[in-house]
Amino acid sequence: MIWVVLMMAILLPQSLAHPGFFTSIGQMTDLIHNEKDLVTSLKDYIKAEEDKLEQIKKWAEKLDRLTSTATKDPEGFVGHPVNAFKLMKRLNTEWSELENLILKDMSDGFISNLTIQRQYFPNDEDQVGAAKALFRLQDTYNLDTNTISKGNLPGVQHKSFLTAEDCFELGKVAYTEADYYHTELWMEQALTQLEEGELSTVDKVSVLDYLSYAVYQQGDLDKALLLTKKLLELDPEHQRANGNLVYFEYIMSKEKDANKSASGDQSDQKTAPKKKGIAVDYLPERQKYEMLCRGEGIKMTPRRQKRLFCRYHDGNRNPKFILAPAKQEDEWDKPRIIRFHDIISDAEIEIVKDLAKPRLRRATISNPVTGALETVHYRISKSAWLSGYEDPVVSRINMRIQDLTGLDVSTAEELQVANYGVGGQYEPHFDFARKDEPDAFRELGTGNRIATWLFYMSDVSAGGATVFPEVGASVWPKKGTAVFWYNLFASGEGDYSTRHAACPVLVGNKWVSNKWLHERGQEFRRPCTLSELE
């Protein structure tokens, strides 16, 4: 058994030693296999306990029959020399063997296995991260708690439900984060399911305790008071609720007095005109970003759409593409976003993923002030960097990018492979360094990021679009395709319309890889112009 346990420790994926499982679906799939192994180990333990109990039961039944016969005529029974010998033998040795069997701990193997694997289990950060991802999906895709709880998500293959206890735990996570908006939503869902008769370890009193306070924190004093009274109907002795009731009633009486004193002049005041709705073009970026993620973005006019074409592209008469040109499609006009179809094969994708998986780490961003790499809440993914020297496939992919874009990849960054986790996203950002970030790529010595090439290495069941809030463009993932755009004008000035984001993955697994091409080496491939915005 010790040998098996040691072998399992050696064979466990080393990638699991790194925290942040919720940021990568790829690594979460390893957890599924580990949990399956634990279930198998648990079933082996149950079987061993059942076998042990079966032996004890057989022994008890045999002794029950024997003692029933012996107690009818004890003297006559032990008068038989064989019975006398067997009685001595049973009491001297066999009962000791039974004692050893009963005391034998059949759980050693399972406990050893569990102890080893527990060090690779998700931690509190993962659980909180997964919960906050659900909140993010809920907000971005306008999902109500009942839809999520019932598992009615678009594109799902494996329907899953949330219990009242699950909803309660989600509400507690939000409460701990002082996110009272989501606390209210999930505590209300837990309460609804309990009132519908769902059996749970969670009681209504606990739910109402959190719910009433969350509602109060959002300024709805009437509802908070109503919920507190409902709690006290269930538990009249609840100390905190009784205290809250007195406090809420005191606050309400003060507000009523203040309103009475201020109401005298209101009859003479004219009602202020209501403001007109704000045009979509002027909505805050966050709202535009979420609308684009839902496919509700600004639609391109028919006149502009007529300027978008599909074509065969031979890379400016590149010999590799003359007989088999690449399929190219215009996704957007300004900035010009081009999609290449069937540009990376399934076999190449699997090799890239296999190379990246062992070294996936939480994706970081460069701090604009210090230049240091750091993790941030608005980038939920894991990434790895692959050099062209590591595998012929990576080298071939790099050359394909060079042939199709006409840009030199020798000064580009390594191929970055990213896998998005639960609600995985990267909120609006620029790929290029702005003027207030002069040190962003100084260590590379290759200038600014002139262009971005992005491979989609998986289809996504729902969500996961690449969106450009400044212009209203949405580009949806399609396995085997790639999109390309310039981050800088030919003058070297940054194109601020390329500000983009990776929408949260609602359902599915999103794999991408990208290549950031830099200015150095492009002097004759993309000559500089005198006009700032050309």
From Swiss-Prot:
A Gene Ontology term for the protein's cellular component: mitochondrion
Assigned EC number: 1.14.11.2
Major subcellular site: endoplasmic reticulum
Binding, 2-oxoglutarate: 510
Subunit structure: Heterotetramer of two alpha-1 chains and two beta chains (P4HB)(the beta chain is the multi-functional PDI), where P4HB plays the role of a structural subunit; this tetramer catalyzes the formation of 4-hydroxyproline in collagen.
Classification of source organism: Eukaryota, Metazoa, Chordata, Craniata, Vertebrata
Molecular functions per Gene Ontology: identical protein binding; iron ion binding; L-ascorbic acid binding; procollagen-proline 4-dioxygenase activity
Regulation (activators, inhibitors): Inhibited by poly(L-proline).
Cofactor: record remark: Binds 1 Fe(2+) ion per subunit.
Cofactor(s) required for function per UniProt: Fe(2+); L-ascorbate
Keywords: Dioxygenase, Endoplasmic reticulum, Glycoprotein, Iron, Metal-binding, Oxidoreductase, Signal, TPR repeat, Vitamin C
Domain Fe2OG dioxygenase, residue spans: 411-519
Record-linked PANTHER family: PROLYL 4-HYDROXYLASE ALPHA SUBUNIT (PTHR10869), PROLYL 4-HYDROXYLASE SUBUNIT ALPHA-1 (PTHR10869:SF101)
TPR repeat placement: 205-238
Name recorded for this polypeptide: Prolyl 4-hydroxylase subunit alpha-1
Expression across tissues: Expressed at least in brain, heart and lung.
One of the protein's GO biological processes: collagen fibril organization
The protein's role, per its UniProt record: Catalyzes the post-translational formation of 4-hydroxyproline in -Xaa-Pro-Gly- sequences in collagens and other proteins.
Catalyzed chemical reaction(s): L-prolyl-[collagen] + 2-oxoglutarate + O2 = trans-4-hydroxy-L-prolyl-[collagen] + succinate + CO2
Signal peptide: 1-17
Family stated for the protein in its record: Belongs to the P4HA family.
Compartments reported by the entry: Endoplasmic reticulum lumen
UniProt enzyme class: oxidoreductase
Glycosylation sites: 113, 259
Binding-site residues, Fe cation: 429, 431, 500
